[in-house]
């Protein structure tokens, strides 16, 4: 007869959760940011709004984005004029697209991660799927299980409508699953498609235009597990996680799903709120490790927009190279909501290895991953790099 304590001990992994593989994917349609304002105002039949177009051009110029990838192309938009209006009933048209395309793009990223991991997919015990693009039952987690041919007994977690902080949320959840279930291998997938948020311009809601200038499509997948086998290659350890709602930030970022699709509202000084509270989050995370110099750690921050990164840098006195991987992803892909931080994780380990920097985290041992989004919610993940 075994005790409950013995059962519990047998269930737990010994070491910390570890990221073992990363895969990313985008739709084939690539959009150049410099020509996007002309295209956007033409496709939405808004060319008469000349002043607004100039404002939008300035937004795109200041965005620090070179290009983005979008499932929505000219052909699809011409077939779905309701999606091009600012406020037309269009949810059915949007749902028809994303319910199919979100799991499909997720599959592409997951297939790359599984290939890098090098283990049979039958060893995947848990699946976390995260998207802010569309809602369905059974969900995108079920569709991906079918698309990949995972075991029917895989334990699934579906996270809908979390928003831009959720790249941190999925790692927090994956850590808890991996460390509390011996031998667990968690497939994490974030897949985002802007077909649910795309809409024409209006001069009454400029915050809607900000989203049109920043958002792009992408999917990222990671495999997380504890106690790596000799055949598995650890990339980063997930050491500590936290989630918090910032004080006095209610209504700072809102998203509402309705007949017109998903509408976003930025109501307060988001960069200011984040930069004002970032140090508190870092102290809580790094004081136990005796780290107070935030230039001595590597950085992965959700690139909500350039102003957030600029103000965080200024507040903490960060060297420009600290945000290099983050700014690279913003420049090459735009803001892909929950998938962004996983793209940055991928970029960082690739560049670190290419440049012979000694660890997956730019030659440094410790790092931080931040997610920022609706709430205002902040996710903090303390990472430990792996020697390469």
Swiss-Prot record:
Species: Glycine max
Pfam families, A to Z: Chal_sti_synt_C, Chal_sti_synt_N
Enzyme Commission code(s) on record: 2.3.1.74
Underlying gene: CHS3
UniProt keyword Cell inner membrane, yes or no: no
InterPro entries, sorted: Chalcone/stilbene_synt_C (IPR012328), Chalcone/stilbene_synt_N (IPR001099), Chalcone/stilbene_synthase_AS (IPR018088), Polyketide_synthase_type-III (IPR011141), Thiolase-like (IPR016039)
Coiled coil: none
Catalytic activity: (E)-4-coumaroyl-CoA + 3 malonyl-CoA + 3 H(+) = 2',4,4',6'-tetrahydroxychalcone + 3 CO2 + 4 CoA
UniProt GO BP: flavonoid biosynthetic process; polyketide biosynthetic process
Similarity-based family: Belongs to the thiolase-like superfamily. Chalcone/stilbene synthases family.
Function of the protein: The primary product of this enzyme is 4,2',4',6'-tetrahydroxychalcone (also termed naringenin-chalcone or chalcone) which can under specific conditions spontaneously isomerize into naringenin.
Identification of the protein by name: Chalcone synthase 3
Keyword list, A-Z: Acyltransferase, Flavonoid biosynthesis, Transferase
GO molecular function: acyltransferase activity, transferring groups other than amino-acyl groups; naringenin-chalcone synthase activity
Active site: 164
Pathway: Secondary metabolite biosynthesis; flavonoid biosynthesis
């Amino acid at each position: 007869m075994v005790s409950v304590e013995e059962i519990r001990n047998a269930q737990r992994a010994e070491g910390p959760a570890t990221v073992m593989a990363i895969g990313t994917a985008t739709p084939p349609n690539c959009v150049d940011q410099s020509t996007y304002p002309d295209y956007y105002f033409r496709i939405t039949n808004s060319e008469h709004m000349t002043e607004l177009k100039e404002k939008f051009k300035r937004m795109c110029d200041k965005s620090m984005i070179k290009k983005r990838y979008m499932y929505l192309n000219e052909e699809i938009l011409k077939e779905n004029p309701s999606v091009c209006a600012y406020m037309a009933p269009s949810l059915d048209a949007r749902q028809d697209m994303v319910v199919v395309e979100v799991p499909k793009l997720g599959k592409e990223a997951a297939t790359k991660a599984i290939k890098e991991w090098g283990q049979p997919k039958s060893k995947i015990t848990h699946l976390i799927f995260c998207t802010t693009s569309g809602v369905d039952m059974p969900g995108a987690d079920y569709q991906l299980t079918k698309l990949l041919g995972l075991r029917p007994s895989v334990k699934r977690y579906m996270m809908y409508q979390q928003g831009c902080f959720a790249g941190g949320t999925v790692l927090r959840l994956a850590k808890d699953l991996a460390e509390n279930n011996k031998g667990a291998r968690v497939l994490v997938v974030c897949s985002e498609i802007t077909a649910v948020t795309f809409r024409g311009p209006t001069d009454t809601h400029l915050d809607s235009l900000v989203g049109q200038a920043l958002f792009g499509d992408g999917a990222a997948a990671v495999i997380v597990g504890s106690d790596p086998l000799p055949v598995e290659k650890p990339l980063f350890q997930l050491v500590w996680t936290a989630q918090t709602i910032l004080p006095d930030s209610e209504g700072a970022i809102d998203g509402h799903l309705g007949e017109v699709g998903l509408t976003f509202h930025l109501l307060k000084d988001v960069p200011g709120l984040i930069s004002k509270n970032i140090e508190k989050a870092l102290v809580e995370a790094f004081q136990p490790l005796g780290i107070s110099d935030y230039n001595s750690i590597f950085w992965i921050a959700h690139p909500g927009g350039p102003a957030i990164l600029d103000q965080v840098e200024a507040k903490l006195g960060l060297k420009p190279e600290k945000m290099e991987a983050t700014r690279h992803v913003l420049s090459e892909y735009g803001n892909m909501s929950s998938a962004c931080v996983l793209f940055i994780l991928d970029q960082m380990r690739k560049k670190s290895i290419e440049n012979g920097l000694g660890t997956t985290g730019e030659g440094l041992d410790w790092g931080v991953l931040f997610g920022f989004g609706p709430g205002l919610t902040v996710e903090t993940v303390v990472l430990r790099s792996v020697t390469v």
